[in-house]
Amino acid sequence: LDVHKGDDTLYNLEADAKTMMTKLGITDFDQPVEQLSGGQKKRLALVAALVAPADILVLDEPTNHLDHAMSDWLEEFLKKWRGALIMVTHDRYFLDSVTNRIVEIDKGKIYSDGICGEIILTPYMTPCII
């Protein structure tokens, strides 16, 4: 998959979306959204976010409702992402794998800033000076 699309045609976007849907376990492309399970709807929304050309990608718990193979695919996809990634997740190791900087924020205060390995060694909720 071409992660940064540029001037893709509608056909290429549809092909990319179908490839992503298949990787995320959705293979019936004609099934109405209303008939999808909650997890399938979340995965479909993830595909919509990933296929759209963007400079910033915002994801909320992207590995929820994904099995191990799907998470691995998403991890590889995000490693190739050429834009900024803002993600809310409890999976720090996934986060460390797909980002080069992590900022931990709680109640409007920055508590950690760095890479996951450093943040895990930092006492929880110790404010950082940046």
What feature does the model see in each segment?
Residues 1-129:
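ABC ATP-binding cassette signature C-motif
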